[in-house]
Design a protein with these regions (language model features):
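N-terminal non-catalytic cap/leader segment that marks the start of a structured domain
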Residues: 1-99, 209, 267
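A generic local secondary-structure boundary/capping motif
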Residues: 4, 65-67, 88-92, 116-127, ...
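Flexible glycine-rich active-site/ligand-binding loops centered on an Asp-His dyad
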Residues: 96-97, 101-105, 148-179, 217-222
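Short, structured patches in soluble enzyme cores that scaffold and shape functional sites
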Residues: 7, 104-106, 113, 120, ...
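Structural signature of FAD isoalloxazine-binding scaffolds in flavoprotein oxidoreductases
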Residues: 93-112, 129, 261-272
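Catalytic-pocket segment enriched in acidic/His residues
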Residues: 8-10, 49, 53-58, 85, ...
Length: 280
């Protein structure tokens, strides 16, 4: 059962999602669990399901989607995790020997159905998309082994690591953190609802055309290896998000380049999870 956050009747809430409707938890439930991160942290999703199923059904077009977790403590992105040319200069590189990490601010990420913010000035000339599979942590993780990493996963979502390539060439952090340049959602699909983490399919559509396509099995470093490595450096907390890398097919990989422009439609689809749609 998919879970996420949204606004209804001008009130921020969270709950469960189905194909064409959502159901919010009650006000009493929110007084006990202020946000979805607390529900995950306290292992209370069964209680949340029971509570939300008792409330009215809300059509998707009657709510405003929010990022599934509105207050993650960390958003960690993985760089160069599929074999492809480096997106800034197009050079073909050998696979990295070690996992590459960088951070993303919550302010850089919008929700499903929102309009991405085109960076001002020259930064708009190299505004790019990167479709990714996102992992949401369910249990605090520190020094986790690869073999046990699945035990710390709560679920999965779709992610757009919006990037300004000209800025990325001199500062990864700057190029990856323009306000409103990326997104994630539309919801989180729990691990228990998925059968094979090695075969999650990622497909990205730009104006209806497939531009990126890969599976989780194509990753250089597996999801489990990523969790193990990150947890050897820092503590991963419930609700933390890991964006697991983007395959070839970003705008910078085309000749001529196909950077995002006003009027574009972007859709990032993860099989058995959902489709994240945004507009430019």
């Amino acid at each position: 059962m998919n879970i996420g956050s949204f606004v209804t009747n001008e009130k921020e809430t969270y709950g469960i999602f189905f194909d064409d409707y959502a159901q919010s938890v009650t006000d009493n439930f929110i007084r006990e669990y202020r946000n979805l991160r607390e529900v995950i942290e306290r292992k209370s999703t069964p209680l949340m399901y029971e509570n939300a199923l008792s409330t009215p059904k809300l059509k998707h077009n009657k709510i405003k989607f929010l990022p599934p977790i509105v207050n993650p403590t960390k958003i960690i992105c993985i760089g160069m995790n599929y074999h492809k040319p480096y997106p800034v200069d197009g050079k073909s590189l050998s696979n990295p020997e070690n996992i590459i990490l960088f951070g993303k601010n919550s302010e850089a990420l919008l929700a499903h159905n929102e309009i991405l913010e085109i960076p001002a000035g020259d930064a708009s000339d190299s505004f790019d998309y990167e479709g990714e599979i996102a992992v949401v942590i369910g249990t605090q993780a520190r020094n986790v082994s690869v073999s046990n990493a699945d035990d710390f996963i709560f679920g999965f979502s779709a992610f757009n690591d919006g990037s300004v390539r000209d800025w990325q060439s001199h500062s990864i952090y700057a190029g990856k953190n323009f306000s409103g340049s990326g997104s994630w959602g539309p919801w989180i699909t729990p691990l228990e609802d998925l059968t094979d983490l090695r075969d999650l399919e990622l497909t990205v559509f730009l104006n209806g055309e497939v531009v990126q396509k890969a599976t989780s099995n194509d990753m250089i470093f597996s999801i489990q290896e990523q969790i193990s490595y990150i947890s050897s450096i820092m503590t991963l907390n419930p609700g933390d998000v890991i964006a697991t890398g983007s395959p070839d097919g970003t705008g910078a990989s085309f000749n001529p380049k196909r950077f995002l422009k006003a009027g574009d439609d972007l859709e990032i689809q993860v099989s058995n999870v959902g489709s994240l749609k945004n507009y430019i």
